[in-house]
Amino acid sequence: MEKETILQHVREQANKWLNSNIDEATRKEILYLLEHDEKELIESFYRVLEFGTGGLRGIMGAGTNRMNIYTIGMATQGLCNYLLKAFHGLEEISVAIAHDCRNNSRLFAETTARICTANGIKAYLFDELRPTPELSFAIRELNCQSGVVITASHNPREYNGYKVYWEDGGQIIHPHDTNIINEVKSIQSIDEIKFDGNKNMIQSLGEEMDEKYLEKVKELSLNPDQIRKHADLKI
């Protein structure tokens, strides 16, 4: 694809976002890219950040190829659409949500919870950062149908990620991964995302879940006596 063709494409995508219902900070960032930073504009809009078998992962910023509340929103809306189909007839569908300490992780987790509840899906949201294994435990403990953790694992600090888990506490596998990917791809516009959440459908998770998780971890210890014996081991 020639540079002029690429530029035309990314400008069209950027203007499509500007004509959508986006926040003022994102709008200003896009306008700056259009006027002052052609290279970053191309990087931000030349493609759509791909939702793969593990979810999303990318650099944070404005644009279709960046991690932001709108790409997170499209992923969550697609997930919700699939959950409503997969568990049609279930009285209550619920999702557990956790996050790490990266920039914007709390914002992305709260955005995920809002969109879930806007779709009539209950959200269990940890009150602050938690390890991914505790998210998997919470899914099973609360009988959730799915879970999301906001993390980019080992990637540099400018990255963030969005990983989806199923009702067994494990990451999504076939056929659910393919079906969710297809639902996410079907979201063509920011305006299709339901952001208007219901606070009454968001339940905070805290110390009580921590205690249950730690008790279960202790139960799985292969040799508790040895652990107690060497509890003063320095690392």
Residue ranges of model-derived segments:
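Cofactor-/ligand-binding subdomain signature composed of acidic, glycine-rich
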Residues: 2-74, 183-191, 223
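N-terminal cofactor/phosphate-binding cores enriched in small/glycine residues
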Residues: 49, 53, 68-69, 76, ...
